[in-house]
């Protein structure tokens, strides 16, 4: 049976490698969130148990958002079978106040590309446009869908067998 600390650390490492590495989300700016905001995308951080405040972040993490936090909620040990069952809650955090021109992909006909199109991002003045909107929730659900896909496709996560028959809440 793996130590609890190792189980938590291994899950956080798995999240960083298998989930966070596949998505980039907006890094918040505490002082600007309008047209003056220079949009920056980062891979989410993965944290054990709680999301630290800005003054407690590890050196390689620019902000507590975007992130996923793995919280151990419940556990049990069957001493006879030498079996442990752990329940984790994954808390996702992201931030998106609106759409910046530089994050939009535009199609361009390209007969050599799969499907006949390639895509590019706007640069220059058109990349600096900004539209405040209520679509930031889409980032949250895209992040959640990525987590669900990776969990559903895994038989083992960080050395632990997933009890798929229990489902995901």
Report residues per predicted region.
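Small/polar-rich, solvent-exposed N-terminal microdomains that initiate assembly or binding
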Residues: 1-82
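Intrinsically disordered, low-complexity acidic Ser/Thr-rich regulatory segments
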Residues: 56-64, 126-136
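Generic secondary-structure microfeatures
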Residues: 72-76, 88-96, 151
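Short, solvent-exposed secondary-structure capping/transition elements
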Residues: 78-82, 98-103, 156-160
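Oligomerization/assembly interface segments of phage tail-like spikes and tubes
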Residues: 82-99, 107-129, 169
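Acidic-leaning, charged glycine-interspersed low-complexity segments
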Residues: 132-169
């Amino acid at each position: 049976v793996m130590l609890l600390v190792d189980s938590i650390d291994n899950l956080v490492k798995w999240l960083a490698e298998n989930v966070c590495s596949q998505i980039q989300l907006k890094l918040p700016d505490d002082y600007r969130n309008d047209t003056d905001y220079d949009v920056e995308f980062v891979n989410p951080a993965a944290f054990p148990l709680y999301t630290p405040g800005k003054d407690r972040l590890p050196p390689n993490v620019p902000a507590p958002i975007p992130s996923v936090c793995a919280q151990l909620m419940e556990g049990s040990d069957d001493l006879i079978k030498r079996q442990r069952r752990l329940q984790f809650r994954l808390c996702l955090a992201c931030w998106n106040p609106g759409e910046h021109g530089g994050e939009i992909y535009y199609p361009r006909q390209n007969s050599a590309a799969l499907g006949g199109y390639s895509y590019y991002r706007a640069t220059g003045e058109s990349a600096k446009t900004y539209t405040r909107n209520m679509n930031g929730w889409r980032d949250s659900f895209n992040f959640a869908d990525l987590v669900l896909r990776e969990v559903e496709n895994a038989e083992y996560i960080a050395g632990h067998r997933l009890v798929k028959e229990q489902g995901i809440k």
